[in-house]
């Protein structure tokens, strides 16, 4: 309601009920909705009629149902009394006396009210007490009237009223009507007098000692207080203090040092006030350079390299629009592989973003909104490796990032097509020929004729390599007996210990390499079967083979000769 004195619908319903001598009844029918936004349903019964209405509170529901009852009720309404006329014509709550006081202060003229005695009533009848004539001895009292005289500057006004306050208001009203249209008089006091009055007002609450120090400071004069005399008994001592202010000095006496100091300052202050006033020095006005307003950049190129969320918020602030509104739409995926979908709304524009967590999803949504609004992508300004301070020369896998997985078996090297073609070309350049190779220990159970085998040609080797690269297994290698191993060099590339073990197995005896080596280094012969020889005719041959195994063979030709000798011996 605009006017607080206006009656509410509930009040009007109560008046209507009193006019018809009935009792209104309000009933709370229903209460629904969440705790922060409930809705109340109220029923009003007025006589035989009922009305229902809802509101966000019980009071609002009552007001709504009462307003509905006033509109739809068929009961005759009482006649409204007219409002009382305001006797005071002055608008607002300000009385004429208060308004006159403000005007008098502006004019610099005080408003003085003086009450006046009322005029005596004239007695036109003499009480002669004639017989037979009607003479009223007791007259009715006449109404008393108060008079007030108002003086504002050189103007006088008179007011009258039934009370003294009414008389003051009447006089103030007359003064306002007369002085409102008159110009305000200008005062031009002398600068010296006004300055002295202002100084006196300022110095009213200061002590004499403080005033002495202020005057001495303004005139660059030294000040010193000194107790020159102390006399009297201990319980009634008297102190004399001398104060010196430049060329002026004075003495003061009192029963305490503080009192004597104050009296001395009062005496010297009277002499200091006689000095001529100091010339007024105008202080230069301080000039403050205005800082230029910070320019908020909201162009398409602004903010590249920033966080998209911060960049989008700054753009909205520069536009003086509402900040972006982020909403989590859904959360899907396995417990350890979640995927969040975040939506951002800027005005009428809507964009979404996904990510493994809410932070990345929010960032992607802000990036999508920036692109949708016509801004460039928020590219990073520097390499992430430079930020983390990692070694630039390290080309291995970065910590914290999973390596890409493949389904190929381990041990197979994947080559690019260019490298593979170069390998094939280099293999074809090698002249094809037959070379001798040594069999693996797994094939030692085969006959001695298979000890030296013919190696496959370069064409078959290329076929085996191609099958291993493509499929991981080589049927060709299994067919020719290589079993995935590469072609070997001649007999010279086989370790001497393997050769010794193979020859000992063929000859039918066992050899312990550690014992043989230990005894050979010490220059001793074995006692208890370090080397057990079943056939005495082969002892010299085994000793010869042992020496060949311990020494480094320098030439492949010597090895092939030994191999031939051992074969012929067998």
Swiss-Prot record:
Q: Name one GO molecular function term.
A: ribosome binding
Task: Please give the superkingdom of this protein's source.
Answer: Eukaryota
Per its record, what triggers expression of this gene product? Expression in extrasynaptic regions of muscle is induced by denervation. Expression in myoblasts is induced during differentiation into myotubes and by treatment with nerve derived trophic factors such as AGRN (agrin) and NRG1 (neuregulin).
InterPro entries per the record? DRBM-containing_protein, dsRBD_dom, STAU2_DSRM_2, STAU2_DSRM_3, STAU2_DSRM_4, Staufen_C
Output the GO biological process annotations, alphabetical, semicolon-separated: anterograde dendritic transport of messenger ribonucleoprotein complex; cellular response to oxidative stress; eye morphogenesis; positive regulation of dendritic spine morphogenesis; positive regulation of long-term synaptic depression; positive regulation of synapse assembly; regulation of actin cytoskeleton organization; regulation of filopodium assembly
Question: Which residues are recorded with the post-translational modification Phosphoserine?
Answer: 188, 395, 416, 426, 440, 455, 492
Which effect does the record note for changing residue 235 to A? Abrogates RNA-binding by DRBM 3 and interaction with XPO5 and nuclear export
An example GO CC term for this entry is:
neuronal cell body
Where does the protein end up? Cytoplasm; Nucleus; Nucleus, Nucleolus; Endoplasmic reticulum
Enumerate composition-biased segments (Basic and acidic residues).
Answer: 194-203
Keyword terms, alphabetized: Cytoplasm, Endoplasmic reticulum, Microtubule, Nucleus, Phosphoprotein, Repeat, RNA-binding, Transport
Q: Compositional bias (Polar residues) spans?
A: 83-94, 551-561
User: Position of motif Nuclear localization signal 1?
Assistant: 273-291
Annotated stretches, region: Required for dendritic transport = 381-570
Stretches for region Disordered: 71-94, 178-203, 381-413, 545-570
Q: What SUPFAM superfamilies does the annotation carry?
A: dsRNA-binding domain-like (SSF54768)
Instruction: Give the matching PROSITE patterns.
Output: DS_RBD
List the Gene3D superfamilies hit by this protein, alphabetically: 3.30.160.20, 6.10.250.1360
Q: In which tissues is it expressed?
A: Expressed in brain and neurons, where isoform 2 and isoform 3 appear to be the most abundant. Expressed at the neuromuscular junction of the extensor digitorum longus, tibialis anterior and soleus muscles. Expression at neuromuscular junctions is most pronounced in slow-twitch muscle. Also weakly expressed in heart, kidney, ovary and testis.
- Name all DRBM domain ranges: 8-75, 95-181, 207-274, 307-375
Span(s) of short sequence motif Nuclear localization signal 2: 373-412
**What PANTHER family does the record tag this protein with?**
DOUBLE-STRANDED RNA-BINDING PROTEIN STAUFEN HOMOLOG 2 (PTHR46054:SF1), MATERNAL EFFECT PROTEIN STAUFEN (PTHR46054)
The UniProt subunit note reads as follows:
Interacts with microtubules. Isoform 2 and isoform 3 may also interact with ribosomes, and this association is independent of translation. Identified in a mRNP complex, at least composed of DHX9, DDX3X, ELAVL1, HNRNPU, IGF2BP1, ILF3, PABPC1, PCBP2, PTBP2, STAU1, STAU2, SYNCRIP and YBX1. Interacts with the exportin XPO5. This requires RNA and RAN bound to GTP. Interacts with TRIM71 (via NHL repeats) in an RNA-dependent manner.
- Record's function text: RNA-binding protein required for the microtubule-dependent transport of neuronal RNA from the cell body to the dendrite. As protein synthesis occurs within the dendrite, the localization of specific mRNAs to dendrites may be a prerequisite for neurite outgrowth and plasticity at sites distant from the cell body.
* Comment field on protein domains: The DRBM 3 domain appears to be the major RNA-binding determinant. This domain also mediates interaction with XPO5 and is required for XPO1/CRM1-independent nuclear export.
What this protein is called in its record is: Double-stranded RNA-binding protein Staufen homolog 2
